Design a protein with these regions (language model features):
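Condensing-enzyme catalytic core mediating Claisen C-C bond formation in acyl metabolism
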Residues: 5-17, 23-40, 193, 197-263, ...
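Conserved small-residue
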Residues: 12, 30, 89, 132, ...
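Flexible, low-complexity linker/loop segments at domain and module junctions
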Residues: 1-10, 265-269, 345-383
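Active-site-proximal gating segment of KS-fold condensing enzymes and close homologs
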Residues: 93-143, 283-296
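Active-site-adjacent elements of ketosynthase-type condensing enzymes
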Residues: 100, 178-200, 235-254, 278-290, ...
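Conserved active-site "lid/cap" helical segment
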Residues: 2-3, 19, 24-100, 255, ...
């Protein structure tokens, strides 16, 4: 079993998704039980001319998202406080700027890219990190995590290790993913995309809705006592199948157990769990069985992809932001669009929004290919 970790302050966080720009829009939609799933195009949001070489759909969404809730100012203040070489930048993305690479393939002239797409900073999994490093001016460690749907949950774990080992004093975390043909065609080929808004844990669920999001967080060893804390995390791999979770949920169980151990918590200490809940038949079946085995009926749980869609590599940090907002405002978000809950999870699943205090919460990200991460959060000292 892993040993308990020292909590990290989450000094700032923000998220932009189909629900809107920033925490206010996110909280308003969650409280109004309003889905954001609709056709959308944010590409009118430009990058500043100085960053023209990084211009692509993914980096535009990153720039749009980082401007919300004063996060850009908070990140720059941390860099000023600690020094540019003592602030790590850890990013999670499933596809990065692959949309620009797809555009390049479509525009090939013989075997050459058109001049406007001959930009090596785009055609790499590290495009997001390179762009944010340039935009923020960080000179500390810069790491990209690309583990499918758990990518931007795992960045919290990476940051904790960097800070604990003395590699950095603080970390700026980013998770961004946007639509691209590779994802749309891939999930359609697997027959995993629903023709309607997804219904997590509903007995009639029939697949995912794909979304886009950008989320950011600033974590530090010290911070305002009122700030929420990252108190634990667990990571695992199913080592089972490229697209199907282990039928007994072995990886999910290990991630949950390790998160609780690092936080020094028992299952009944948890008030709320934001479930991965993709609305695919097998994923939800396995997660429901694990939840029923590990947690009692007093623990409340919900899945929020009915609000935002499955934002892939950005899902971890987006759903961490939702969890932190739920803790801050004292409510359990609804499991939107779902009506008839999977029997195994019916006792814990909040179909409708519930008002209740939340002091300790978990957020699950159980990714494609069996890459799993559970994050544990605790509320800060009351104001």
């Amino acid at each position: 079993m892993p040993t308990r970790i020292a909590p990290l302050a989450i000094s700032a966080f923000t998220a932009t998704s189909a629900l809107g720009h920033g925490r206010g829009a996110l909280a308003d939609a969650l409280r109004a039980d309003r889905s954001g799933l609709a056709d959308n195009d944010f590409t009118r949001v430009p990058l500043p001319e100085v960053f023209a070489e990084y211009d692509c759909r993914n980096n535009r969404l990153a720039w749009h998202g980082i401007a919300a809730d004063g996060f850009l100012d908070a990140a720059r203040a941390a860099i000023e406080r600690y020094g540019a070489d003592r602030v790590a930048l850890v990013v999670g993305t499933s596809t990065s700027a692959i949309g620009a690479t797809e555009e390049g393939y479509r525009a090939l002239d013989g075997d050459r890219l058109p001049a406007r797409l001959r930009r090596p900073v785009l055609h790499t999994p590290h495009s997001l990190g390179l762009f944010l490093e340039a935009a923020l001016g960080t000179r500390g460690p810069c790491l990209t995590v690309a583990t499918a749907c758990s990518s931007s949950a795992k960045i919290f774990a990476k940051a904790e290790r960097m800070i604990r080992l003395g590699t950095a004093d603080a970390a700026i975390l980013a998770g961004v993913d946007t639509l691209c043909d590779s994802v749309l065609f891939g999930f359609n080929a697997l027959e995993l995309v629903s023709s309607q808004r997804c219904r997590p844990f509903d007995t009639a669920r029939d697949g995912i809705s794909i979304g886009e999001a950008a989320g950011f967080a600033l974590v530090e060893r010290d911070g305002d006592a009122r700030a929420p804390r990252l108190v634990g995390y667990g990571e695992s791999s199913d080592a089972y199948h490229m697209s199907t979770p282990h039928p007994e949920g072995r990886g999910a169980r290990l991630a949950l157990a390790d998160a609780l151990a690092r936080a020094g918590l028992e299952p009944d200490d948890v008030d709320y769990i934001n479930l991965h809940g993709t609305a695919t038949p097998k994923n939800d079946e396995v997660e429901a069985a694990v939840l029923a085995d590990v947690f009692s009926a007093r623990v409340r749980a919900s899945a929020t992809k009915g609000f935002t869609g499955h934002t892939l590599g950005a899902a971890g940090i987006l759903e961490a932001a939702i969890t932190l907002l739920a803790m801050e405002q004292g409510f359990v978000p609804a499991t939107l669009n779902s009506r008839d809950a999977e029997p195994a999870v019916a006792a814990q699943l909040a179909i409708e929004r519930e008002e209740r205090p939340i002091r300790v919460a978990l957020s699950n990200s159980f990714g494609f290919g069996g890459s799993n991460c559970t994050l544990a959060f605790a509320a800060g000292t009351p104001h």
